Amino acid sequence: MRRLTLVRHAKSDWSLPGQVDWDRPLNKRGQRDAPEMARRLRSRKLKPDRMISSPAVRALTTASVMARELKVAATQLQQDERLYLASPADMLAVVRELGGDAKHLMVFGHNPGITEFANQLSASEHIDNLPTCGVFTALFDIGDWRDLAWASGQEAEFDYPKNHP
């Protein structure tokens, strides 16, 4: 059994004129939400073995904050450029290729791809939108990430910052 947790980056700052999309930092809400969502995961004992993030500043910062809160070693956080504005097919390829022996893999990315990826992986659930810093976790009855297939996951968790005000 494998567990995949998808995390959309926390809320980012759009206020800097001329800011390149790749370089957008987290805003105050994002800086608050990322550690809070990590604490929720920790309270449910959902600590990943490996994390893979888009290298865009907002995604990588979210991943780094969550890694620190979840006490995941920095060596277990990997960046992959294919996750920046990735399609579901791109994300599937990254997970299959880089999941390795992780029993619980956490992937950080962007909309719309990450919401679409969650929906295409789920055998039964559909979410309209994975909000910023939202977390979607599914379980897969596979022994190897290379066997991950569409519509094969059973939703285990769906949470987001405004779910518990």
Predicted regions and their residues:
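Charged phosphate-binding loop/patch that engages nucleotide di/tri-phosphates or the phosphate backbone
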Residues: 154-165
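Residue-level preference for the first positions of well-ordered beta-strands
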Residues: 4, 103-106, 135
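Short, glycine/serine-rich, charged loops/turns that create anion-binding
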Residues: 11, 56, 112, 142, ...
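Domain-level recognition of soluble alpha/beta enzyme cores
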Residues: 125-156
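A glycine-rich beta-strand to alpha-helix segment
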Residues: 102-118, 122
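Glycine-rich phosphate-binding loop signature in dinucleotide/nucleotide-binding domains
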Residues: 44-46, 98-103
